[in-house]
Amino acid sequence: MNDFVFSDIPDNVKPMASVEFDDPLTIATGDVLNWTLWLTRNFPALSSIIMRLPSSLVSMVTSSFEGANQMVQVKTSTHNLYSLSLPTHARKQIISQLVEHEKNHIGPKSKDCVMQRLLNAHRDSESKISIPTPDATLRSEAVGFTLAGTADPPNILALGTFMAARDSEMQKGLYKELKAIWPDLRSPAPSYNLLHQLPLLRGIIKESIRFTHGVATGPARLVGAGGARIGGYNVPAKASSFSAAATSDCS
C-alpha cells in the first residue's frame, strides 16, 4: 500500500527493512486501528475535537489515540525521525514527513503513484485545476489510503495462503517461482514490478481478491420484509448485509 501511495519510503521506515516489523509507520498504522475508527465514523465532530486536544491530556483518559497522534499530529521533540529538510527541534507527524519526502527527495519518482498524480494534477492539460494540490489535501489522501489499505490486504492474503496451503502442487510451483527471483530471504524483497511478472503468484492474488469480501464492521443487519436496493442492486428480504471497514461498501 505504501508503494501505491508514495514513490519512495525512507529506508528507516520501510517495513521489510525491519526484522520485527517495528518501524514507526507500521506501529502507528496498527495502533490507529481500534475502536476510535468507530468513533470517527459515527461521531466525526467529536473525534475532530479530541484530535485537537493536547495528546498529553487525552492520554490521561485513554491511550487509544496515540497511533493517530503519531500519524496526523505535530509533536515537539529533540528526536528527529527524518533529517531531510526538517529542523532538529521538531518531529512532524509521520504522514507529513512522508509527503515532504515525496516532494523533495532526489531520485526516480513513479508518476502513477497517488502522491505524484496529486502533485502533478494541475499540470495535466485536461485538468480543471490550475494550482498545486494543497499539502493538507495530500496528507488527508495519504492517511485515507494508508489506513484503508491495512484492513483488506491481510484478509485477502490470509485467504490466499489458506487455499494455497491445501494444494501441495500449487505450493511447490509458488515456491519455485519465488525462489528463482529471491534466492536469499535475508536480502531485500524483490520489487513490485518483478513480483508482478510471476504468473502463479499473480493468479493466486487475483483469485484471492475475487473470493474475499471486505472486512465487516459492526453487526450484520437483515433486510426488511419488502427487500431493499443497495448500491444499485436489488437485495431480497431477510438477506444479511454489513458495512465494510473504511470503505462503507455493502456486501
From Swiss-Prot:
Show the coiled coil region(s): none
A family per Pfam? p450
Needed cofactors, names only, are:
heme
For the protein in the UniProt heading, the enzyme class is: oxidoreductase
Q: Mind telling me what this protein is named?
A: Cytochrome P450 monooxygenase ppzG
Swiss-Prot/TrEMBL keywords: Heme, Iron, Metal-binding, Monooxygenase, Oxidoreductase
Keyword Transmembrane on this protein? no
